[in-house]
Every structure is written in structure tokens, then in C-alpha cells.
């Protein structure tokens, strides 16, 4: 029944992916050995979206773990849920990509990609009716960004009619590992624009700000950032994992959320925000949840939605609450802030409710917005890219792996095109006719 194959690539991808499996295994009452210990039919009704049922009633994640060096995988394997994964599904090299996109995409990663695709085929063949793939990776490193995008394009070739969904961590100078992050990110976005159906932009800058300002953590660690990511990932996949009506599979979500094929970069949000140590002590009301969820401070992408307009929005509420109240609050928000929703897509805000709240909370809300304000994030990366590229700084690391400067120029202009497409639809009104250039849709193909 409608399975999703999960792939995690690179250090960041494996860390947030590992955390994701811990959180959803907990929600579905699957312990670290893959045994079910719960008592609710809701937990098992759609368990096979993410898990294979093996012999002896063991549930095994439909997950493939990929990296160009063994380090992170060893720590996943020795972590709390390390034993739940299928041992054959760990695919790793020894050389590492050294934060170099070209190594991940053209040299080291290209050597490993076939063995990953073998595992992908094996997992897909075990599916009754595969709906698509989800990839967790970062755009700033070498493996997740370079090899991750290579995997996407290879999978796209082989499964052109399946949905490709990514959780992509966008780099930020505030939480930076490497100088060349803007290069890697721009080259990756160039690929994501063409080859994915839905991309959740998780932005280290926003995560850092949430930890620092809202959660009052003075020195946020990657563990703290990943805690937010896993809460968000659990939220946006709720509709896929639990029985429900709205956005119940990846394709339906895409149909609701993506008005133009290239504009599929979503801004996730979450409420209530809690740090790892302290879960909330008082339950929030539905109006508070709704207010918080639309607040710029709760966005996992460092963009202010008030600087743009929403093309589409999906909201997922979790916990026992009155549907009537949820609908009223959502209408209320849209009426009060109507100027921030484009008027040429009526009813562009959809709401789903799931009875099972995340662990430690009475109720929570997850937000998925397709906002034109996401251009701020691409602009930020683009400015950093241009600053270095103008001086051709660090380019020899990439050309040394066989890349051409031309590819950088193309990636740069593709990202700038994306920004201006968002800008164009931000300014569009319902009554103007045919002012859109027709080359929008076709302009993307190389």
C-alpha cells in the first residue's frame, strides 16, 4: 500500500534521518528491535508506508543510508535505533567528499551511485505500490549535496512517474562548517529546481535563531537543531503515516501545493516550539497554535513570510481538538492577513487534523507554506556565491574534479531565474491578463 522509500545521504542527512526514524518509531510504538508494543490500530493502519514487515512481526524501516565515509554511519549504527535498519541498506565509501560538491556528484559519488541504486531497486521491488522517494541531505557539504542530487537525477531517470521529495538543509554563515557552502548549495539548487517535486527548505539560520531567541539556548548544538528538524519532519509526514483525508500521499500534497513546476520550495513551520530538555507544561489552545504556526519566528526557513505572499499553504494539526474551532481559526487568519495570500488562487489554504499528538505534547501544529518570500533564502546564498565566484576563489577544487566554470555560471543564473519567478508571482494580481512570459515553464530544461 502506497510506500515511500527513504534515503539519507551524507553526514547531515544521516543525522537528521536517524533522528526522524527515532521519532516516528516512537510515535508508531516500534521499539529499537522493530517490535510493535502499542495498543492503537491507528498506529498500524498505515505503518507500511515507511516500514517493511519482516518475518516474526518485525518492522524494518524502508530506509537507505548513504555516505562517502564510514564515520556517521557507524554512529547511526551504534545509536539508540541503530539495530532497526536493514544491514544491507548501509552503503558507504571510504574516501569522503571533503565538502566538495564535484567529488560527490562527479567522481567519488559517481563510483558509489550504482551500488546505491541496486539497494533502491531492491527496496522498490519490495513495495506493493511505490508512491515516491524522500531524501534527507544538506546542501552545504559534498556528499549530501553532490551525491544526493546525483542520486535524485538517477532515480528520476528510472522512476520518472514517482514523486521525489527532499528535506534539504540550507547552509548559513551562522552555523557554518565550510567556506565553500554557497558553491555547493547553488550547484545543488540548480539540480533540485529541475528534478524534485517537493523540497522542504530547512534553514540552519532559522533553526539557530529559534534555538537562540525562542528557546533561549545560548550555544545551540547540532543536536538542538536536529531536535527541531525531527519535530518538523514528523509533523509534515503525519498525513502520510496516519489515516486521514487531506494530503494523504505525496502526490496529493504536490497537487495542492505546487502551482508552477519550478516553484516547489516549501517553508516549514512548527508550533509549539520546545527545547529538547523542557516539554511544554501547559497545553496551548487552538487559536494560540494557529497564531504561532503562522508567526515568522516559527518558520524553519530564515525568510519573513510578510515580505512575500503565500501561493499555497497546508496546515496539519495534531491532538484531540475541535475541527470546527480549527476551521474557524484558519479562516480567521486568512481573513485578517488576506494581503499575504495571492488572490488568484482561491482557497489556497488546506487543513488536516490527526488525533495522535507527538510525544510530550497535548496538541501541536505543523505548517507547510509555499511562499514567495523563500526568495530571500536563495538571494542570501546567491550573494555569498557571487562574492566568491567573482574572484574565482576555491574554484580549483572543483575544476580539479573535472568541472567547468560554465556549470557554475549556469547554476548561478538558474538560481537568479528562480528568484525572479517568485518575485513575478508575488506581484501578480488576479485581473491582469497574459503578462506572464510563456518561457517560464519551458525555460527550465537544459
From Swiss-Prot:
Cofactor: Mg(2+)
Sequence positions that bind GTP: 11, 69, 138, 142-144, 204, 226
Subcellular location: Cytoplasm, Cytoskeleton
Top-level taxonomic group: Eukaryota
Gene3D superfamilies in the record: Helix hairpin bin, Tubulin/FtsZ, C-terminal domain, Tubulin/FtsZ, GTPase domain
Gene Ontology process terms (BP): microtubule cytoskeleton organization; mitotic cell cycle; salivary gland morphogenesis
One GO molecular-function entry: structural constituent of cytoskeleton
Principal place of residence: cytoplasm
Gene Ontology CC entries for this record: cytoplasm; microtubule
Tissue: Testis specific.
Keyword terms of this UniProt record: Cytoplasm, Cytoskeleton, GTP-binding, Magnesium, Metal-binding, Microtubule, Nucleotide-binding
InterPro entries linked: Beta-tubulin_BS, Beta_tubulin, Tub_FtsZ_C, Tubulin, Tubulin/FtsZ-like_C, Tubulin/FtsZ_2-layer-sand-dom, Tubulin/FtsZ_GTPase_sf, Tubulin_C
Residues annotated for Mg(2+) binding in this entry: 69
Ranges for region Disordered: 424-446
Biased composition (Acidic residues): 429-446
Similarity comment text for this entry: Belongs to the tubulin family.
Subunit architecture: Dimer of alpha and beta chains. A typical microtubule is a hollow water-filled tube with an outer diameter of 25 nm and an inner diameter of 15 nM. Alpha-beta heterodimers associate head-to-tail to form protofilaments running lengthwise along the microtubule wall with the beta-tubulin subunit facing the microtubule plus end conferring a structural polarity. Microtubules usually have 13 protofilaments but different protofilament numbers can be found in some organisms and specialized cells.
Its job: Tubulin is the major constituent of microtubules, a cylinder consisting of laterally associated linear protofilaments composed of alpha- and beta-tubulin heterodimers. Microtubules grow by the addition of GTP-tubulin dimers to the microtubule end, where a stabilizing cap forms. Below the cap, tubulin dimers are in GDP-bound state, owing to GTPase activity of alpha-tubulin.
Name of protein: Tubulin beta-2 chain
The encoding gene: betaTub85D
